[in-house]
Amino acid sequence: MTRTVAREIAIQLSFAAQLAGDDARETADTFFSREYFATLAEEDPLFLEYPDEKQLDYIRRLTGLVYDHMYELNHMIEKYARGWRLERISRVAAAIMRCAMCEILYMDDVPNAAAINEAVELAKGYEEPETVAFINGVLGSFVRGEVEPEAEAEEETEEETKTEE
């Protein structure tokens, strides 16, 4: 199973948990029972291959992070979706953005550009072109507003430390 497929499963799992109002970890336990996963494979080719341990860990970690940081992520979406309230954004688009934001903020093994690109590519399978562009814009603004200033501050601190030595 590729990371892209694992990411799409994580987005679907996060979406399902959020829609049901359930803890993502409990939803994942049900989702990844071999019997249930097999029934999903009958309906959607995305589920044809059961994830290996590495991909299963990635999916569980990402969905857990989305669940744990839901309030913060929703706030970030509204902040960078200027003029849009979360209620006006499709639930699928919001789920895609939450997962990408979690990868950017909390998963060091995923480069920011890769998280955005993967989110945009996955959105193309679910959303209209205008919404795909919207997702790209929100995530780009998010990185410029939240992540890059932190990286610049860290670089300045490192330079000051080197200068003092």
Predicted regions: what is each one?
Residues 1-132, 136-165:
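N-terminal interaction/assembly modules
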